[in-house]
């Protein structure tokens, strides 16, 4: 327990909140270039081939980003937009690619939740 005099001299240290998405640097999204597009398998109770890409961001960070939706057109050197949001069953994946923005096409034939997948309204 500090004395009053010690508190006057030093003060209490405020606890700093650690960011869950450090590569975004407090921005809502960041642009980057795909350096590798591949599939990976999820953690124990689940089984699938999840589509992910390694992205070199404009600020120099290299992150792994999840590609949501059925099918995608990404390949190496594609320019993508990254947002925060982890994938619980993929360790190390803390970002999502934004569908329907820059080089990422929206999901084809998507009828519901279209705004999340960059799909236009069907005629």
UniProtKB/Swiss-Prot annotation:
Q: Name one GO biological process term.
A: translation
Q: Which UniProt keywords apply?
A: Methylation, Ribonucleoprotein, Ribosomal protein, RNA-binding, rRNA-binding, tRNA-binding
Show the PROSITE patterns listed in the entry.
RIBOSOMAL_S12
Q: Where is the composition biased (Basic residues)?
A: 113-123
Provide the positions where the record notes the PTM 3-methylthioaspartic acid. 89
Region labeled Disordered — which residues?
Answer: 101-123
Looking up CDD domains in the UniProt record yields:
Ribosomal_S12
A GO MF term: structural constituent of ribosome
One GO location term (cellular component)? small ribosomal subunit
**Self-association and partners:** Part of the 30S ribosomal subunit. Contacts proteins S8 and S17. May interact with IF1 in the 30S initiation complex.
Tell me its family: Belongs to the universal ribosomal protein uS12 family.
Q: What is this protein called?
A: Small ribosomal subunit protein uS12
Q: Which organism is it from?
A: Laribacter hongkongensis (strain HLHK9)
């Amino acid at each position: 327990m500090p004395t009053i005099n010690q508190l006057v001299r030093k003060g209490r240290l405020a606890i700093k909140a650690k960011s869950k998405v450090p590569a975004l640097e407090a921005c809502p999204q960041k642009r980057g270039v795909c350096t590798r597009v591949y599939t990976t398998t999820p953690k124990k109770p689940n089984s699938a081939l999840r589509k992910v890409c390694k992205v070199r961001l404009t600020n120099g960070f290299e992150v792994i980003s999840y590609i949501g939706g059925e099918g995608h057109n990404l390949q190496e050197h594609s320019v993508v937009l990254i947002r925060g949001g982890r994938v619980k069953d993929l360790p190390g994946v803390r970002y999502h690619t934004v569908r329907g923005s820059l080089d990422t096409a929206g999901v084809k034939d998507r009828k519901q939740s279209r705004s999340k997948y960059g799909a236009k309204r069907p005629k």
